[in-house]
Amino acid sequence: MKKMNIAIDGPAGAGKSTVAKQVAQALSFLYIDTGAMYRALTYAAIEHHVSPDDEASLKSLLDSIEIKLVDEQSKTRVYVNNTDVTDQVRTEEVTKTVSLVSSHGQVRKEMVRQQRLLAEGTNCVLDGRDIGTYVLPNAELKFFLTATVEERARRRYEENIQKGFKQSLEQLIKDIASRDEFDSNRSFAPLRKAEDAIEIDTTSLSISEVTQTIIGYVKERV
């Protein structure tokens, strides 16, 4: 099979990461969790007391740390300077701050450079908000996952309960709607569907159903 890059984009809580992971596992492709890379930088910024508004300092911090992703069957482990921060990058504080950190042009350009290097010459699945439009505009297959704000908030609420995080469903609905607006209106590489992306509404679909739908499209291309 010739090299294939699969881009999966969509708003927060649409199921991108879980689906991307399962698609990659089913096809024996590399999974690159781009969101975890931004979360790792956000975590480091909080630890180093770097303001999420300070683009220059964030870029300097990014240049000074090593972010590593280790793909395991059950999850992607995230390391900053060889320290496992997999759980720390999923806290509420990081989640609330990551959109602002990732909105800066200098930060995104460097992250995208790293992501393109990882994807070069290999079969891989990447998920994020600008994979099909900016990171890998020439990806062989592009998907855009959507779901209602209420459904996405419900999924995040259940995830948080499993992780021991407490946040009301009503607040999550507000937070996700706010993040949608921010991500869609940022000046650099905003969240939007690529013209050639296949849109899948996941509101009433299971993870398995979405995964199988994407795999079906992949098999058509092989």
UniProtKB/Swiss-Prot annotation:
InterPro entries: Cytidylate_kin (IPR003136), Cytidylate_kinase_dom (IPR011994), P-loop_NTPase (IPR027417). PANTHER family: CYTIDYLATE KINASE (PTHR21299:SF2), CYTIDYLATE KINASE/PANTOATE-BETA-ALANINE LIGASE (PTHR21299). One of its GO terms (biological process) is pyrimidine nucleotide metabolic process. Its EC number is 2.7.4.25. Keywords: ATP-binding, Cytoplasm, Kinase, Nucleotide-binding, Transferase. It holds the Pfam family Cytidylate_kin. One of its GO terms (cellular component) is cytosol. It comes from the Bacteria. The gene is cmk. It is found in: Cytoplasm. HAMAP family: Cytidyl_kinase_type1. It catalyses: CMP + ATP = CDP + ADP; dCMP + ATP = dCDP + ADP. ATP binds at G10, P11, A12, G13, A14, G15, K16, S17, T18. The keyword Ligase does not apply. This is Cytidylate kinase. The keyword Kinase applies. GO terms for molecular function: ATP binding; CMP kinase activity; dCMP kinase activity.
